């Protein structure tokens, strides 16, 4: 089993959550330990080399099959690139989880690091 940190369309209440994560164990809400930059250009994405804000999201425990399905959705490794990062859960616990990064910035900067702020 692996942990995956989701910050956009895979979060609960967004369009990709049910098809991909409805049977996965919810671990908790949290944010990245390090700062990154979130942009939206139709869909949200995070850029690793810009240090703007902590990215807000949710952690799920997923099996290998689910992780491969998410890799396919995200176009890993050709479109998004998956990397393990430290996540601080709202409980205060720190865990390592996969996060999908995009290689370049374009679109609208989400300064808060929370896609829900952008979506209203």
UniProtKB/Swiss-Prot annotation:
Residues that bind substrate: 7-10
Active site, renumbered: 74 (proton acceptor)
GO cellular component terms, A-Z: cytosol
Keyword DNA repair: no
UniProt-listed CDD domains: GGCT_like
An example molecular function term from Gene Ontology annotations: gamma-glutamylaminecyclotransferase activity
EC number(s) on file: 2.3.2.-
Keywords, alphabetical: Acyltransferase, Transferase
InterPro entries reported in the protein's UniProt record: AIG2-like_dom (IPR009288), GGACT (IPR039126), GGCT-like (IPR013024), GGCT-like_sf (IPR036568)
Pfam families: GGACT
Domain of life of the source: Archaea
Protein purpose: Putative gamma-glutamylcyclotransferase.
Family classification: Belongs to the gamma-glutamylcyclotransferase family.
Protein name: Putative gamma-glutamylcyclotransferase MJ1514
